[in-house]
Amino acid sequence: MQFGITTSKIDEIGLITRAENLGYDFCWVTDSQMIRSNPWAVLALAAQQTRSIRIGTGVAVAGLRLAPVTANGIATINRLAPGRTFLGIGTGNTAMRAMGQPPMGIKAFEEYIRVVQALLKGEETDYTLNGVTHPIQFQNQDFKYIDVENPIPIHVSGFGPKTQVLAGKIGDGLITGIPRGGTIPQALENVKKGAKKVNRSLHSFETFALVNILMLKPGQKLTDELVIQQCGSAIMANVHFVVDWVKESGNPPPDYILPFWDEYLDFHKKRDYKRKHMKLHQSHYSYLDPDEAKFITPEIIKAFTIAGQPAEMVEQIKELESYGLDGINFIAPLEQQYRLIEDFAYNVISKM
């Protein structure tokens, strides 16, 4: 099992170097322009201040920039950290919805990845913009402005069946989430469907999951304020995703959110209509909105997190590994991130 952290704050590159020293395998840098620092700037600093930890976007949002711009961005980082750079890429949950815009559609997303993939191989490929199509290719590759000689794996973010199938069809890996991406066996079955469509092998394919973790100390209870603050922002980020997903898809909410679904919708409807999209995602994986703390109950914590004493967490992670999961990543609340990545490394990773 591989372990990763997530960060995005330009002046806290020390968190990444600390994670590297603690034995973490990889780091995701988020791409959410209305909330976080610019991912390319963060990655450039991380590349220069680390030596072994793998770094990349987790995830770059296709709707925010042209495909050649994304390819150039990650290839530039690869020049600074050759052989340990990857590109996580998605349609855009928070990044698009925080502007009141929908994520990119699946057909456009597949074409976007195709273009990025070809460019990162140094190839010429047809590219269409504003209805006009021309061949494009990175020029003057021998000048080393970028690095497309060392492979850059593309990990496709897939929290639903369609994008999970797409990951299996064209990606080098899948990034899903627990619980909102379904179970790992379900996700991998979708990946296999995608691979079967193009008759490709999944021999080197890797699957990663964004998880919510809660490591309890002796005597701690799920109702303790410190416990709620530790896992609350991650849980509510999942809730915010489901609110938009149900609204856009027309699908019923998943079972794990039903215990407080109606109550949360009533709460959300009372917000300023014009700014609902901003308020919904403002606290995204950073802090627990005080007005939302009431929704974090012991039952909800159990449904949304890998929780328990360290030994119990080890067993839960080993079970996920047995299903075929290759790596997990978590996002710690901003004010607790150093302590949590250290506690997790000392008490869980070291026992794996």
Predicted regions and their residues:
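Active-site mouth loops of central-metabolism enzymes
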Residues: 1-10, 60-68, 148-159, 213-216, ...
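Hydrophobic faces of well-ordered beta-strands that scaffold small-molecule active sites
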Residues: 3-7, 27-29, 54-58, 85-89, ...
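Short, acidic/polar
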Residues: 8-19, 73, 158-166, 227, ...
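Conserved, mostly hydrophobic/aromatic
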Residues: 23, 46, 77, 116, ...
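Glycine-rich, proline-tolerant flexible connector loops at the mouths of alpha/beta enzymes
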Residues: 26-49, 61, 93-96, 178-181, ...
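An alpha-helical appendage that flanks or caps ligand/catalytic pockets
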Residues: 102, 106-143, 189-319
